[in-house]
């Protein structure tokens, strides 16, 4: 109220739209005299109402001179009918892997993992300070797990997927290969063994 008393402008109420329309949508009135036309915001409104613009009366479509309707039908009928496109077989690669390839890939990885397991167990058994051997075993297990997960991320390559399964199961193959060596060392001191490697 203090600002209004000092100012010479009268404040406008919020609901007073006639004196201050603001950004309210409105239709402008183009009054050009006696023959003024009402402004249309959309050109399609007259078409919907069935009216037409002045001077835009559609002309009747005339047939070309010397051409009968039957002739035009014959021309259209003489064109060949559109044929459907046949499917084309594109050579691609298998999205699956044959079982013998899978077995070969996994066995190849397991043979390498078995050699690693035998070496690590032999080193752990004969060394006095077993800290380094245990640390290498931990690094080997982590490397197999991470490597298998990274290989499994390759899309659309079933051979790489089989390789990832072999790499992730590598530590189990290493344990299975080191188990007979452990049984052999155990049976050197114990007499109750089967085939010299299986204690009972």
Swiss-Prot record:
One of its GO terms (cellular component) is plasma membrane. It is found in: Cell membrane. The chain crosses the membrane at residues 102-122, 134-154, 159-179. It is a multi-pass membrane protein. Keywords: Cell membrane, Membrane, Transmembrane, Transmembrane helix. Residues 47-67 are annotated as: Disordered. This is Protein Rv0461.
């Amino acid at each position: 109220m203090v600002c209004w008393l000092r100012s010479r402008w009268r404040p406008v109420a919020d609901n007073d739209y006639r004196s201050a329309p603001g950004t309210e949508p409105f239709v402008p009135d183009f009054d050009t005299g006696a023959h003024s036309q009402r402004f249309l915001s959309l050109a399609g409104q007259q078409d919907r109402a069935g009216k037409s613009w002045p001077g835009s009366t559609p002309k009747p479509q005339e047939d070309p001179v010397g051409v009968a309707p039957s002739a035009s039908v014959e021309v259209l009928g003489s064109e060949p009918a559109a044929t459907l496109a046949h499917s084309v077989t594109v050579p691609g690669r298998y999205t699956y892997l044959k079982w013998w390839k899978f077995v070969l890939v996994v066995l190849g990885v397991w043979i390498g993992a078995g050699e690693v397991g035998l070496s690590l167990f032999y080193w752990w058994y004969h060394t006095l300070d077993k800290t380094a051997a245990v640390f290498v075993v931990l690094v080997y297990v982590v490397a197999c797990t991470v490597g298998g997960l990274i290989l499994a991320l390759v899309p659309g390559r079933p051979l790489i997927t089989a390789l990832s399964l072999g790499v992730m199961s590598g530590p189990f193959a290493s344990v299975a290969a080191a188990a007979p060596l452990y049984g052999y060392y155990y049976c050197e001191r114990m007499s109750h063994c089967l085939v010299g490697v299986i204690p009972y």
